[in-house]
Amino acid sequence: MDINSQEHTTFKLSGVLKKVLFFNEESKYCIAVLENNQKICGQYFDTHIEKIVGEEIILTGNWINHKKYGVQFEFESLQLKEAELFFFLTKIVKGITKKSAQELLKKYSEEELIEILNNNPNELLTFKGIKDKKLKTIVESWQKFKHLRELGSFLSKFGVTSNFITKIYSHFSEVDNLIEKIKHNPYILIQIKGIGFKRADEIALSLGINKQSDFRIAACMNYTLREYCDNNGNSSIDKHHFYKLLDEALGFEEGFSLYENSLLTMINKEEIYLTTQERYAPSMLYFAENKIIEFFKERAEEISNKKIISNFKEYLTYKEKTLGFSLSHEQTQAVEIINNGSNTLFLIGYAGTGKSTSSRAILELLQEIVSYDDIITIALSGIASQRISDTTGYRSMTIQSLLMQHKEKDFFPYKVVLLDEASMVNSVTFYQIISKISIDTVFIVVGDDGQLPAIGAGNVLHDCIKYSLAPICKLTKIYRQNEQQAIAVIANDIRQGQVPQYKEKYEDFKFYDVSIDNYYAAKNGQNQHNFSQLRFENTERILHTILNIASTYIQETYSLVKEKNIAKALTLFQIITPMKGGVLGVENLNVQLQKLFNSSREKSKKTKLYEYKLSDKVIHIKNENMKSQSMTSYKNGSDEFIEKRVFNGQLGLIIKLDFDQHVCVVLYPNDDMVVFYDFDMLDSLLSLAYCLTIHKTQGMEYDNALIPITFSHYIMHNTKLLYTAITRAKKMCHIVGEEEAFKSACKRIETTKRESVINDILKNKFNFS
């Protein structure tokens, strides 16, 4: 038989997978060997093919004669022998391990096992490791998910995990013939969070979808534009840059004509908007930012000339006596703007300039005409929300809690809304807030434009200030209780690109110099290998210093947890670093710090990134609706759950690892919320939080913060990042590392500017004309 003449014939081959010789992460192409030493090759879409070594597999494909490697079997599909049911039992049904599934399928045929699970599950109690509690979990999970079998069988060969299969099934629950719909247009899977264009495209191309199909290009446009905005913070994109990104994603060389046709179609469908000549925005961001412009324009036309207090100076003198503080000229101006009838104010100030004091004075003034209960303060994070409440004395909520509580109403039932930490708020969230604020509600926006911009798309605070969309009061004077308190002064020097007086002795700031002697001479005078060794040794010294400082906070952290003051324990001490990778990156520091702060030997859950233990400090890393309970309901053992939005950046504590249910339970004390994470969701939704990136700490405040600084992180060194990191510390800021790297970061002013819909629309229309 001539092997090369059989290219249109399909064969089947089975055997035990002996060894994986090669696997390309990018193309998913692999070369492997069966136990009979037969070589096989093809694309396998599960990136963990090594996990099925030793398993019996069934291949469908064709024999080829490779010039270099000889006769091989090139497979089109690769499935475990018990593919359908084995996959379903191990990936979907809770309580059944891989070993248990193998034993069950060894004793029973598929039909027999399905019959037992449906009608006689108690028979499984005869198997080792399956007791009453586990059997209950297995049966409940089987009944809930048995209709997923067909979908699981179809998607398993593409490496789609059980968690995603469940999400797909739930999302498309009303769709008939779902598998056929996916085969026709696999890009509908992009609707599922976590399945990007690349994964959907792999499935599509393996199913024979035309590379130039309209829905392939349209799906890529939508996804690429959304990802570009989310990842870069821009809410619009230049046409030529957009086309370049599409070329990369689709594998085309200048596919401009294809893009032009698809883009016109999507603009006509209002899926993408033209913001200005040759700039485009996704529909949601265009809508949100356009509405923000309209909101402030409408409010500007409704300003009243009626004063709240006619004799303002006399009132202010009285208030300063009763409240026990005096206002500066700038702070007085802020209060006076509201007194003179403005319904909107941007109160902008850098660290230590008295934004909280000014906010309190403004709210006290407004309480002359509204009741205490008519005033609400809000912030993105629970910690920031608590802080504004503590400093002003007025009620506060997280933005999401306020939105959820009043989602059925047209407007918030408050006459005054104060938004704090506004630099953190992206376009969509800002729109959600203003869409609930009526024209006669006073809206005060408080923020620090020296900090990093919001996570997510948009640059609302910056744009509103740039185009004066409402009255602005800028606070510039820094307040210090005494000369030994320097955090605010040092931070503001850095913000201006100046090297501060960092070597002085302060009660709230300390620089630990762990430098390579004569750094620049060593760099220029030694070969690369020797200098790299010097850098490595110095990095280890920095790490040792960090761990020594961190160890001084262990006992107090333990005490706070023991006293059940979890919120305080989570914010007592925080290490903040610019990058994820490397010895002084988030991932390694989290591992090292976990050894210090959590020496528990109880059973833990290992994932690709971390080993999660009871009482670990963790952070939620992606906005997601999660299964949750109030702390009271959880303590009472309630079986009732609610779906609640958990935001990127929320700090929590692991209070239970349930190995029967495969669930990690996390307490978020600032939100009085307990959240349940399936084990297979941990790396995508959760992370250890002993160390965080600077971006993750936006809007947060910690009693004590430690920041490593080294030339290893040079790419991330700039004044905005360092300013943001230092201003996270309330009582003490430790900076540990290389002196020259610190001085370099202090002088490297961030020049990157975000592109936005607001800027596109208003740059030539300063007066809304």
Regions flagged by a language model, labelled:
Residues D373, Y414, I439-V442, S468-C473, ...:
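Short glycine-/polar-rich loops that comprise or flank the Walker A/P-loop
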Residues T332-K510:
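ASCE P-loop NTPase helicase motor core
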Residues M1, N704, T710-S769:
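Helicase C-terminal subdomain and adjacent C-terminal extension
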Residues H8, Y29-V33, C41, I52-I57, ...:
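Accessory alpha-helical DNA-binding modules that contact the DNA backbone or grooves
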Residues L13-L21, E25-I64, N426, V591-Y723, ...:
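Conserved nucleotide-binding/hydrolysis modules and their immediate coupling elements
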Residues S156, A218, N222, R226-N231, ...:
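Pre-P-loop entry segment of helicase/translocase ATPase cores
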Residues M1-T9:
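OB-fold nucleic-acid-binding modules
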Residues Q333-I337, S342, K355, I362, ...:
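Conserved helicase motor core of P-loop NTPases
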